Structure formats: structure tokens, C-alpha cells
Regions:
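A structural signal for well-ordered alpha-helical scaffolds and beta->alpha junctions
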Residues: 43-46, 88, 92, 117-121, ...
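PAPS-dependent sulfotransferase catalytic domain
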Residues: 1-126
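PAPS-dependent sulfotransferases, especially Golgi type II membrane carbohydrate sulfotransferases
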Residues: 99, 126-188
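Short catalytic/ligand-binding loop motif for oxyanion handling, primarily in non-cytosolic enzymes
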Residues: 47-52, 114-118, 142
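Short, surface-exposed basic-aromatic patches at helix termini and helix-loop junctions that form
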Residues: 30-34, 122-129
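Short acidic alpha-helix initiation/capping motifs at coil-to-helix transition points
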Residues: 27-28, 114-119, 147-148
Length: 188
């Protein structure tokens, strides 16, 4: 979106690592030219995110992780994280921290972006002081494997209807503070 609308270059993994990583701390990112970068941090509702993560986990080194029922997957320890919800909390907290430390950043809830791309186009235009750029909407689903025209973005972002037990399991690891920072509400 930012590349198409504002002719921005994407920095690859040799610049501060993998896009899904925990945001680097100042002693790491300060070694790079962050002054000329716009960092775009994308947040996703943890209730729809965990379902997507279950379907296509970042951590697929454990061959049977995709075979776990959702309840077991949510409680499965991933790398240094107690579970995927703890990972969601820590990663999003790290994005807020880094956003506060660096000169140019924007935090976007993907659900809000999907509803009103014009608002985010205007926010980025303000940051870049480039109000002459027309809005080119992004209407296809994009992930690390590329663009997917057949995937319905709105339905993939919709919060699933979980049973009470699953909601309790998810909520037991969710940080209310992080949820508030992300403008999400706990399911009850």
C-alpha cells in the first residue's frame, strides 16, 4: 500500500530482520538509518489473528503444530513465548515501544485499514508531507507468500464465534493493557 501509493521502497530482512519479529530495541535499531524510514506497524485483533496463526503458523518447525486442535495450539509454547497469545502481547508491546522511540512511524489496525484506506493514506501523506499522491486502494489479500486475489479479506479479519471455554483460554493470556493500546476489546 505504502509502496504503491507513495513510491516507497521496502527494506528487506537484512534491515532489522524478519517483519514478524519482536521489534528491536534502541541499541539495535540505532545502528541503522531509521531517520529516512517510515515504519508501519500493523496490528490485528488477537481473536482473528490466533485463528489465522493456527491455519498458517509462523513457527512450523514443529511438524505437527498444524494438526493441533485450536485449543491445544493456543496453549502450545512457541519459541521463547509461553504461548501464541503471550507472543501477540509481547510483539505488539514491542511495536508500540519502538514507535515511541523512532522518528517516523504509524500504527495501523488492519481491520480499520480494511474499512477506510483513505484515512491511512491521509495519515501517511501527512507524515511524508506528500499530499499530491492519489489513493490506490489495496483490494487483495497480501502475506509473505504474495498477493492472493481469491481470499476474502473482510471474512479473514472477522472475529470468530468461539465457545466460552476457548474465550477464557485466550483471555487468560491476553494483556488488557495491550488490548487497550491496540483499541481492541476483550470478548466476554
Amino acid at each position: 500500500f505504502a509502496g504503491k501509493n507513495f513510491n516507497l521502497k521496502f527494506q528487506h530482512y537484512n534491515f532489522l530482520g524478519w517483519k514478524h519479529r519482536l521489534a528491536p530495541k534502541k541499541d539495535e535499531w540505532s545502528k541503522f538509518d531509521v531517520q529516512s524510514c517510515l515504519f508501519i506497524f500493523c496490528m490485528r485483533n488477537p481473536y482473528s489473528w490466533v485463528q489465522a496463526m493456527h491455519r498458517e503458523p509462523y513457527y512450523d518447525h514443529y511438524p505437527k503444530i498444524k494438526d493441533l486442535p485450536l485449543e491445544n495450539f493456543i496453549q502450545f509454547s512457541i519459541e521463547d513465548y509461553e504461548n501464541c497469545i503471550a507472543m501477540w502481547n509481547q510483539k505488539n508491546d514491542s511495536y508500540f515501544r519502538m514507535s515511541d522511540e523512532i522518528p517516523n512511524s504509524i500504527i495501523i489496525n488492519v481491520e480499520d485499514f480494511n474499512v477506510d484506506q483513505g484515512k491511512f493514506h491521509a495519515n501517511i501523506a501527512d507524515i511524508l508531507n506528500r499530499h499530491d499522491m492519489p489513493l490506490v486502494k489495496m483490494n487483495s489479500y497480501v502475506n509473505g507468500r504474495g498477493r492472493h486475489e481469491q481470499k476474502d479479506i473482510t471474512s479473514s479479519l472477522r472475529v470468530p464465534k468461539y465457545d466460552e471455554k476457548l474465550v477464557r483460554i485466550i483471555n487468560s493470556s491476553l494483556s488488557e493493557e495491550t488490548m487497550k493500546k491496540c483499541n481492541y476489546e476483550l470478548l466476554i
